[in-house]
Swiss-Prot record:
Any one of the GO CC terms: plasma membrane
Stretches that traverse the bilayer: 11-31, 140-160, 168-188, 199-219, 250-270, 274-294
Record's subunit section: Forms a complex with SecD. Part of the essential Sec protein translocation apparatus which comprises SecA, SecYEG and auxiliary proteins SecDF. Other proteins may also be involved.
Highest taxon of the lineage: Bacteria
Keyword Protein transport part of the UniProt annotation: yes
Protein name from the UniProt record: Protein translocase subunit SecF
InterPro entries assigned to the protein according to its UniProt record, in alphabetical order: SecD/SecF_arch_bac, SecD/SecF_bac, SecD/SecF_CS, SecD_SecF_C, SecD_SecF_C_bact, SecF_bac
Keywords assigned by UniProt, alphabetized: Cell inner membrane, Cell membrane, Membrane, Protein transport, Translocation, Transmembrane, Transmembrane helix, Transport
Cellular localization per UniProt: Cell inner membrane
Family indicated by similarity: Belongs to the SecD/SecF family. SecF subfamily.
Amino acid sequence: MKLNLNQQRGLWWTISAALILAGVISMALSWNQYQAPLKPGLDFTGGTRLQLERDCSKPDNCKTPIQIAEVRQILDEQKLAESNVQVIGQNAQGVAIRTKDLNQEERTKLTEALTAKLGQLDVEKSQIDTVGPTLGKQLLASGLLALIVSFAAIIVYVSVRFQFDYALFAIVALFHDVLVTMGFFSILGLTRGVEVNSLFIVGLLTIIGFSVNDTVVIYDRVRENLKYGAKRSISETVDIAVNQTLGRSINTSLTTGLPLIGIYIFGGETLKDFALTLIVGFAAGAYSSIFIASTLLAWWRQRQERGGYNTMDSSPEEI
């Protein structure tokens, strides 16, 4: 299979633009509803999280699955109608509730009401956690700072190893990956109530590392072909470089994606959204490395050549 990327680069850019536009629209709607581009989880907003499971060792305690409507009725009675509710556990015998910050008396009152409605709860398997709003803001600030630092470090690294225009388009590709992933989860937040937490920031940082590595491999091949290859146009050189590294890109994406799909299908509730973040981000990263970063570089070098600028790579061969 041979790709002629630059002949159809307008198509690749249009696909990316459409995905990003859909995500931006969703984030705007999310901001109107949640005052945030994505639906924030407990880690960022602060509040109380209750993860409760029935005690199935008691006779007839687990005959029927827990119904969300039953839980919501209790929450309404406790004036906690805005809470997020999710049925969890084997055979739907558990429930996860995220709500506003509750004091000890309010927690006790809620768990007693749930016990009366749902049956005896397993104390050992049940958990109640509280995250203060100050800690939530600190987590968000730290996550954003980590993203900014990572982008800055990547610009420096790629500029030193290659040239600044390589670094510029590598960053454009990374922004593409982050925006596509954020847009996807913004849509999930609006349609399915999916929240993002501190693991989402970790996922974005992991996606950035994966994507820039893929881009650097392609850029390295482009540079080598420019130095030692026959006289070709920059578009031909980039197409050849992408095709030379295509097998490696596909294999890397498959070997990282398949385990993540397994985690998403068979993993626990906590890991599912994290695995989905990486699946979406790695797919976007593989796409941007092949179809965005490389074609943007070719387009820019063509413009430079028409303007009479020197586009020869003078960066060090190895670092």
